[in-house]
Structure formats: C-alpha cells, structure tokens
Amino acid sequence: MALFPDLVPELKAAMPQLRGRLLGNEPLAPLTWFRVGGPAQVLFTPADADDLGYFLAALPRDIDVTVVGVGSNLIVRDGGLPGVVIRLGGRGFGETGTDGDVVSAGSAALDKRVAEAAAAAGLGGLEFYHGIPGTIGGALRMNAGANGRETKDVLIDASAIARDGTLHRLSNAEMGFSYRHSGADPALIFTSARFRGEPMDRAAIRARMDEVQRHRETAQPVREKTGGSTFKNPPGHSAWKLIDAAGCRGLRVGGAQVSEMHCNFLINTGSATAQDIETLGDTVRARVKEHCGIELQWEIKRIGRALD
C-alpha cells in the first residue's frame, strides 16, 4: 500500500519538457548505506543541471524538496519523505576533470573518485577525500574532512541551483564553512565544484591515498551497513573515546548496534529499522552526557518522518 498520494501524473503534465525520471512512492532504503527507511513520495533523478533548473522552476512552491546523494551519511526515517526527493547521478552530475592545478567535479562524483582524478593529474592536497564515503555534494554541504584536512581547505567555488531554478556560484568565503557544516542557504542544490590542487609527485600522492585507505579499512567497519561517523567530535575530544568511556561499545537497540571496531559508528546488523538506529544514537548521547557532561551532536543527517 502506498504511503503517499501519487503526485507523478500531475508533475509530468505540468513539465512537458522534463527529461529526468519521476517515480512515485519509491523505496529509499536501497539508496542508503544503512539500508533502512521509508519511501519518497516522489523520487526525481534529473538528466543534468538544466533539467534540474527546469524542474525546480516549475515545481509548486508548497511541495517540499530534499536532496540525497549516495546515502552514506544519512538515516531516512521509516515513514518516508513527503514531497520530492532529488537524487543527482549519472553523467550529468558525476563527471570529474582537471585543468592546470584546478580539479572540477560534479556534485554526484564520489569523493574517492575526485581524489583519484587529482592524483592522476599529479595534484595533491585532495588525498583526504579518498577515505570519505560520500559525494562532492555532501562534502560541500557538511564541509567533509578527514586526516586533518577539510573541504574548506581546497575549495575554490561551487555552483548551485536555487529553489526557483536560478543558477548561483558561491566562493569559498560565501560557503560559510565551519566544522562539519556549511552556512550556505539550505535550499541551494549543489551541482558542481572546483578545487585547488598542489603539484606533487604522483607516487607520493598515491602513497598517501593508500595510507588513508589502509587506515580506513583497519579502523572502521567498512564491510558493515553503516552511515559513517555518527557524531561530531566535540572540541578537544574524540567522540569514539567518549562513547567507549560511557560503556556503549557493542550496545544494541533492536537490530542496531554500536560497532565493536569503532564506537562512533552505528551498524545495521541485518534487521534494524531506522527507528532502532536513531533510538540507539539518542541512547548513546544520553549515556555520554550522563557520564561526562558532554552532549554529542549528530553528524549523520536524519530526514523524513517516523512511521505512524
């Protein structure tokens, strides 16, 4: 049984020139790394940036819009998402390229692929992206970083489309970056970005990337259904150490568990619901607060509504 009224026929009729794909009541769980969550009332996959702009300009303003990438840092709640979920992908948003010391990437390009494109051109400084399991769109939105580097350290500018379909370009300063956060208008949908690399020896760059990958595979539960780092590191502290000290290593709620390998990762052991995972996260936060007085902040984005 469909959770939401079908908006697809109405939208198709209002947008005769649309080239992207519209699907109604489309399951989102297969599109997230946790493999949990309800459906999107409408899932739209635009053909390219022009198609996205056309769609947004024609979309009634009272319909909510949510953007998802590869779903690596995301919990979709079990009741799904009303309105339109936009998923960027394919050739229209996944391309990468280099020109001199500039690396360009579509917002659907995997962070890892951007690091590899830079390395192939002999450009360093972006190796940290090799260990981040997401896309450039997500990296822009949350100032993604690892190994002492962040998106703000390498970004030149980003292109985005507003809710009314207009195109915008934001400089690094206009992005309003802070720790795991961008102050850019939440309604903007990033479509591409440019980064500044540093000319370096290709072998040295590859060695750094290999080290990043080795660290990730030995220290993080990369083979599990997980959303990546769950909580932001509080100033002066490591979230995983606080979680471990509060006795939460291996803690379970339903089919969700705090990873034994890395305490700042929650995993779906196979039968978890989105509610299990979110409840586990909130339980961890409460125990850490009780143990040391520090309130952990979610790094994973949680969207949608609970199942009635």
Swiss-Prot record:
GO CC terms, sorted: cytosol
Region annotated Disordered, chain positions: 211-236
Cofactors that this protein relies on: FAD
Domain FAD-binding PCMH-type: 35-200
Biological process per Gene Ontology, one example term: regulation of cell shape
Biased composition (Basic and acidic residues): 211-226
Pfam families with a match to the protein in the record: FAD_binding_4, MurB_C
Record's keyword terms, sorted: Cell cycle, Cell division, Cell shape, Cell wall biogenesis/degradation, Cytoplasm, FAD, Flavoprotein, NADP, Oxidoreductase, Peptidoglycan synthesis
Catalytic residue positions: R180, S229, E299
Enzyme Commission no: 1.3.1.98
Gene Ontology MF terms in the entry: FAD binding; UDP-N-acetylmuramate dehydrogenase activity
Reactions that this protein is recorded to catalyse: UDP-N-acetyl-alpha-D-muramate + NADP(+) = UDP-N-acetyl-3-O-(1-carboxyvinyl)-alpha-D-glucosamine + NADPH + H(+)
Enzyme class, spelled out: oxidoreductase
Main location: cytoplasm
Pathway: Cell wall biogenesis; peptidoglycan biosynthesis
Localization (cell): Cytoplasm
UniProt keyword annotation of NADP present: yes
Family (UniProt): Belongs to the MurB family.
Family matches, as NCBIfam families: murB, PRK13905.1
General function of this protein: Cell wall formation.
Name used for this protein in its record: UDP-N-acetylenolpyruvoylglucosamine reductase
Organism this protein belongs to: Rhodopseudomonas palustris (strain BisB18)
Gene: murB
